[in-house]
């Protein structure tokens, strides 16, 4: 049976709050770094559910992250304009660079020297010397935020792409603008140098990809507008194709002439980063606190191109101030080739390379005032030791030619397995954690060695649908009792269940005997079944909403919520809570005391939208009041202070309600789907209670 061309590899909860950015390791495609609103930088092994390292140090949310080419360093930029560079082997902050006025949107490491470039929403581009801890040069010229930044393969140029629709090519030696490209009609979201030729590709929110000759600075070709904005572009390592990633789609393009070789339907949403490893393209996207990783099998790609209509674009000629490009070797296409050799530096005497043994190796000087313990939380020591603490510097990171991820079988009509069959495990058990729904072969070098021999497993090719292993002690989750909110067929709801207790048994029930043929009158009664109950439900709900509205419009939100709680109608409570979620200023300690006892009931409801509303309210309360709860529980009032005693009593009530909820949430975090994701995020927030 054939295997899938593209599939979801894994989904995981990456942070305790929203994920803002992510990046895949450019060398191996087997490591991933994420940054979030929680000000943390988390490191992952692709295919595993456990976080390897959690790096802190930022004082504002992290908006951009980037690996260096060897996957030894990670740079993270924050909303406040600060960059921190982490060395992953000692897991330390080695540099803190400040200078941008606003959020840093993109960064890139120089291919040879110890330099980093950054682009910001302040429209400026800065070049940093990592050794000297300072900004070398600030490039000005963009009129909107800088979306993407790249060094050329030879390290002599820097190209920047902005929301102002322009692409600027900077000469690092001369320290000035070398060329500007203005052909896009929307913000430029992706730029990529050809690995060999003097060719630049750019993708934009105008849904096109354009190719530029870096000798003549003319437009080579442009794709036809696609269905959605271009999110990411990357050349194949041999330079034969360009892969364009957009909303749920992956396209393989050629440029002379412009043609589309193949299109993959991937389903990754708004993909954030892609990288090519072995014969596969790995893509990752994020939504709220979750990160999803997808795989496309490039060995299944068609190599027969479909020609596209060339876009009528004006040719771009070099600007008058541009200097002639030095002579370079030519590629098969006739274009000059990038020279990737590190340029020689001037020295007073020749030196033999000094190869240090591992004990002699030292990291760059660490910034003053940065404590190692504050910056690092190694959550998976086994994976960390395997990937980032090898015996030699050469094998510091997973190999580029790592074993490809096995593709699941393409079973007609089979549904994609739900993610999160296994919850995140503690670090002590990380060595035997399953990789994902499609486990990687044990021969893969990037995987940590397992502590115990793996049980005999059926080969992946004989399994009809790949599935994760389930721990023997796991009890089946009663998720089937939940009535989904996005169902596409009747759920056979009992309308009497929505009535208040006083009216619950008033509606007559008509059940025709199944042993004989129904008459017309019985069929009509069957169709009317539940109608009277529904009328009573709607009448009661309308009456109650009128009461709540009258109190609410009088300006007393707390009393109106108390009246809803006393009505014991969960549907009305959910409606009111959804309104309150839109206006966070309504929430205070008094409101928490009133609402929290009912949130546990909603949390155990059989209706999915009730559970989601309860989770959203609990998350809001925990994010805004956890520090207040912990502070008051730690320091109860000692003297006579009525206001403080009232606040302490309210915090104690809220704290006890939340602690009582924690056990139920911990039990439910193992379920799959959206509910499981909500419960896992809620569990992380509840763990912050002391």
Swiss-Prot record:
Compositionally biased intervals (Low complexity): 427-444
Does the keyword field hold Cell division? Answer: yes
Recite the UniProt keywords alphabetically: Cell cycle, Cell division, Cytoplasm, Cytoskeleton, Microtubule, Mitosis, Repeat, WD repeat
Report the domain of life of the source organism.
Answer: Eukaryota
Compositional bias per record (Polar residues), positions renumbered to this chain: 304-318
* Mapped WD repeat ranges: 14-54, 57-96, 99-138, 141-182, 184-222, 225-265
Q: What does this protein do?
A: Participates in a complex which severs microtubules in an ATP-dependent manner. May act to target the enzymatic subunit of this complex to sites of action such as the centrosome. Microtubule severing may promote rapid reorganization of cellular microtubule arrays and the release of microtubules from the centrosome following nucleation.
- The name on file for this protein is Katanin p80 WD40 repeat-containing subunit B1
Q: Where does this protein come from, organism-wise? A: Strongylocentrotus purpuratus
């Amino acid at each position: 049976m054939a295997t899938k061309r593209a599939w979801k590899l894994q989904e995981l909860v990456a942070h305790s709050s929203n994920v803002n950015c992510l990046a895949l390791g450019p060398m191996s495609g087997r490591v991933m770094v994420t940054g979030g609103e929680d000000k943390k930088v988390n490191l992952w092994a692709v295919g595993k559910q456990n976080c390897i390292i959690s790096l802190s140090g930022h004082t504002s949310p992290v908006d951009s992250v980037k690996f260096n080419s060897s996957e030894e360093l990670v740079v993270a930029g924050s909303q406040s304009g600060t960059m921190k560079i982490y060395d992953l082997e000692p897991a330390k902050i080695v540099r803190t660079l400040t200078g941008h006025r606003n959020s840093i949107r993109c960064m890139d490491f120089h291919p040879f020297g110890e330099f980093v470039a950054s682009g910001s929403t302040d429209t400026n581009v800065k070049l940093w010397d990592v050794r000297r801890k300072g900004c070398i040069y600030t490039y000005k010229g963009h009129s909107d935020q800088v979306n993407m930044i790249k060094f050329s393969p030879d390290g002599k140029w820097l190209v920047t792409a902005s929301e102002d629709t322009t692409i600027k090519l900077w000469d690092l030696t001369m320290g000035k603008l070398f060329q500007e490209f203005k052909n896009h009609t929307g913000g430029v979201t992706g730029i990529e140098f050809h690995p060999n030729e003097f060719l630049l590709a750019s993708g934009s929110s105008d849904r096109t990809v354009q190719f530029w000759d870096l000798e003549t600075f003319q437009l080579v070709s442009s794709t036809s507008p696609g269905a959605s904005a271009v999110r990411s572009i990357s050349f194949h390592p041999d330079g034969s194709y360009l892969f364009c990633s957009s909303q749920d789609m992956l396209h393989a393009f050629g440029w002379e002439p412009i043609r589309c070789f193949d299109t993959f339907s991937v389903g990754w949403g708004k993909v954030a980063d892609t990288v090519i490893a072995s014969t596969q393209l790995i893509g990752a996207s994020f939504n709220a606190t979750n990160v999803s990783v997808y795989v496309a099998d490039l060995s299944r790609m068609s190599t027969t191109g479909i020609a596209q209509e060339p876009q009528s674009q004006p040719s771009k000629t070099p600007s008058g101030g541009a200097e002639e490009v030095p002579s370079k070797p030519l590629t098969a296409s006739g274009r000059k080739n990038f020279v990737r050799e590190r340029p020689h530096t001037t020295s007073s005497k020749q030196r033999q390379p000094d190869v240090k043994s591992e004990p002699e190796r030292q990291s760059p000087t660490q910034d003053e005032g940065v404590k190692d313990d504050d910056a690092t939380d190694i959550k998976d020591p086994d994976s960390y030791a395997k990937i980032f603490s090898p015996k030699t510097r050469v094998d510091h990171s997973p190999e580029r030619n790592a074993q490809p991820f096995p593709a699941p079988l393409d079973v007609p009509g089979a549904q994609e397995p739900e993610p999160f069959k296994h919850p995140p495990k503690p670090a002590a058990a990380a060595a035997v954690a399953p990789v994902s729904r499609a486990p990687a072969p044990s021969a893969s070098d990037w995987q940590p060695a397992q502590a115990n021999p793996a049980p005999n497993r059926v080969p992946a090719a004989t399994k009809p649908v790949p599935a994760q292993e389930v721990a023997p002690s796991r009890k089946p989750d009663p998720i089937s009792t939940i009535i989904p909110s996005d169902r596409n067929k009747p759920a056979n709801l009992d309308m009497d269940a929505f009535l208040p207790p006083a009216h619950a048994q008033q509606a007559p029930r008509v059940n025709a005997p199944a042993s004989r043929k129904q008459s017309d009158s019985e069929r009509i009664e069957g169709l009317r079944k539940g109608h009277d109950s529904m009328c009573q439900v709607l009448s009661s709900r309308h009456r109650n909403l009128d009461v709540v509205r009258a109190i609410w419009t009088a300006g007393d939100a707390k009393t109106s919520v108390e009246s809803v709680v006393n009505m014991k109608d969960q549907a009305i409570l959910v409606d009111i809570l959804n309104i309150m979620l839109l206006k966070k200023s309504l929430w205070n300690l008094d409101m928490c005391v009133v609402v929290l006892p009912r949130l546990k009931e909603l949390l155990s409801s059989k209706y999915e939208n009730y559970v989601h509303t309860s989770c959203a309210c609990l998350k809001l309360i925990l994010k805004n009041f956890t520090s207040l709860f912990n502070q008051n529980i730690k320091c109860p009032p000692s003297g006579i202070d009525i206001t403080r005693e009232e606040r302490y009593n309210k915090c104690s009530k809220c704290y006890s309600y939340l602690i009582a909820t924690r056990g139920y949430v911990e039990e439910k975090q193992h379920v799959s789907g959206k509910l499981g994701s909500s419960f896992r995020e809620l569990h992380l927030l509840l763990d912050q209670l002391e």
